[in-house]
């Protein structure tokens, strides 16, 4: 009977949430459950491509596609709304478009930028966070070149860019920048030698997930393209002039008219308001990706702190993990609907590739180090596969990297 259908509610159409939906809609009939997907935008965007749109090497439109283009409307009700409250005990979710009841809840609300309380960071630095921030940043970079070219009183700081963070996002953004800068210089008649790109990293090593050989390749490649690295140099503040850094216990002002923060992400702030034991927007889940005390609430993606059995630290927040969690959660939701026990999540690490612009990269694929053009090719394969897994061959052909 239709009135006996369980209500399955999925919050967020990022990698984890949309993967849950696209897999679940293939596994159940419309009579088995009333499935609702809530997302604040009517589009999904490829978050792992944000560094490209932020640098301007691709358009922001290349990042996104309509959620409804991959949703089976006969089985899934899509609602464009912003979630404002999760009441786990009353089994209700409040949004700006009304209140939704649930029997099974999947929380996959995605990430936000984490500034670690650094003074002025939110006010003065660009973030690599979503489609809107990407549009603003790429436009700002070009505006500064245009301003420099048209001004009688040249301000060299218009051609200075400082990036905070030499982790994955920071390095990939730097790679795209080194592709974009020659285009901008050519367009606006600017001498490329006048452009100054600086990367500041507090940790003693950049890209800590990779071997020294791969890190050295990335550093050499980017330095040859004009990037200056300041490693082991914490940023203590951001202001209207740029970043304030600490060097040998002394503060120094680094000046630029474009400063970018790419050194941290956290789960949605709604997590702290809705659940206990949340740190930086992430909650520790059980092995089946539900949370303690609530066998009908799954938390996946950037809001999930999943610690594999026998280990001490949670897995990092990556699209690969989020996608696998989404696939697994779809199966577990199906199990619950059929009165079957849930299964434990087992992550399969297929590797990681960090792009250095369109033609180079470093990475580890199935335990083997790769670099150069081979890594760049693998990155395109990974990006295209991610689109294929959500939208099939048609979407992969339209939005993929080949």
Swiss-Prot record:
Coiled coil: none annotated. The active site is at residue 172. FAD binds at residues 12-16, 39-40, 83, 302, 319-320, 379. Its EC number is 1.6.5.9. It catalyses: a quinone + NADH + H(+) = a quinol + NAD(+). GO terms for biological process: aerobic electron transport chain. Binds 1 FAD per subunit. Belongs to the NADH dehydrogenase family. This is Type II NADH:quinone oxidoreductase. It comes from Staphylococcus saprophyticus subsp. saprophyticus (strain ATCC 15305 / DSM 20229 / NCIMB 8711 / NCTC 7292 / S-41).
